[in-house]
């Protein structure tokens, strides 16, 4: 109905805005984003609905649809044999949450963008990711983020829409760069069990891929020098 449509449109606009905030949208995309914002304000005024409240309701609707779709995909996977599986370490809220860097560092690694906050020091950090898997190997990275124990986002690896396509080795190398940069500031970094299983294939006892000190220093300098 009209209200539900407005709620979903509000949430999808929020997701597109997050994409634009990462400076990944082209000019037509940004133009549509601005025009759609004006349209949503007008529709909200006509319907007497608050956009922020509508966005939260739209998020719940989208989450329900995705859960139903995942169940259907799982049934089809069982019926048809080998197929991609979508694995989630992060919730939709963790994926769409805004975050800011006090000392931003950024590196392009092929079709992947690595971002991190160099101001973070002496923290326990865990890497979480949402990605697809086929034949028990990482197929496509959707998004990877680094979280402190209190849930703050301090790093991220995301694919570039303008440069589609990456391998599991590309993702592994990007994760190594991110870990090296974070550990340069005496942070302790570990990866989620899902990432250990499908992206790294090996780890030490604390769930962190083994990285020699020399390699860590080299990767940290690389991130700093390429920004």
Curated annotation (Swiss-Prot):
Motif (Nuclear localization signal): 31-35
Signal peptide: none
Region CPSF4-binding, annotated ranges: 177-212
GO-annotated molecular function: protein serine/threonine kinase inhibitor activity; RNA binding
Post-translational modifications: Upon interferon induction, ISGylated via host HERC5; this results in the impairment of NS1 interaction with RNA targets due to its inability to form homodimers and to interact with host EIF2AK2/PKR.
Coiled coil: none
Known partners and oligomeric status: Homodimer. Interacts with host TRIM25 (via coiled coil); this interaction specifically inhibits TRIM25 multimerization and TRIM25-mediated RIGI CARD ubiquitination. Interacts with human EIF2AK2/PKR, CPSF4, IVNS1ABP and PABPN1.
Annotated family: Belongs to the influenza A viruses NS1 family.
Domain notes: The dsRNA-binding region is required for suppression of RNA silencing.
Biological function: Inhibits post-transcriptional processing of cellular pre-mRNA, by binding and inhibiting two cellular proteins that are required for the 3'-end processing of cellular pre-mRNAs: the 30 kDa cleavage and polyadenylation specificity factor/CPSF4 and the poly(A)-binding protein 2/PABPN1. In turn, unprocessed 3' end pre-mRNAs accumulate in the host nucleus and are no longer exported to the cytoplasm. Cellular protein synthesis is thereby shut off very early after virus infection.
Protein name listed in UniProt: Non-structural protein 1
């Amino acid at each position: 109905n009209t209200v539900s449509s407005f709620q979903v449109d509000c949430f999808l606009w929020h997701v597109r805005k997050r994409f634009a905030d990462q400076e990944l949208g082209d000019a037509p995309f940004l133009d549509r984003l601005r025009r759609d914002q004006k349209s949503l304000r007008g529709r909200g005024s006509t319907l007497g609905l608050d956009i922020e409240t509508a966005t939260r309701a739209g998020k719940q609707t989208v989450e329900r649809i995705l859960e139903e779709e995942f169940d259907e995909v799982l049934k089809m996977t069982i019926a048809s044999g080998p197929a991609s599986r979508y694995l989630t370490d992060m919730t939709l809220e963790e994926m769409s949450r805004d975050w800011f860097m006090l000392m931003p560092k950024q590196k392009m690694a092929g079709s992947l963008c690595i971002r991190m906050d160099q101001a973070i020091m002496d923290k326990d950090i865990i890497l979480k990711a949402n990605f697809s898997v086929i034949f028990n190997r990482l197929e496509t990275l959707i998004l990877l983020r680094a979280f402190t124990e209190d849930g703050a986002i301090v790093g991220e690896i995301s694919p570039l829409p303008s440069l589609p396509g990456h391998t599991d080795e590309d993702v592994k190398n990007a994760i190594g760069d991110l870990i090296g940069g974070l550990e340069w500031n005496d942070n302790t970094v570990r990866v989620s069990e899902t990432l250990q299983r499908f992206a790294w294939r090996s780890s030490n006892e604390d769930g962190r891929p083994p990285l020699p000190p020399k390699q860590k220093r080299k990767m940290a300098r690389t991130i700093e020098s390429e920004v």
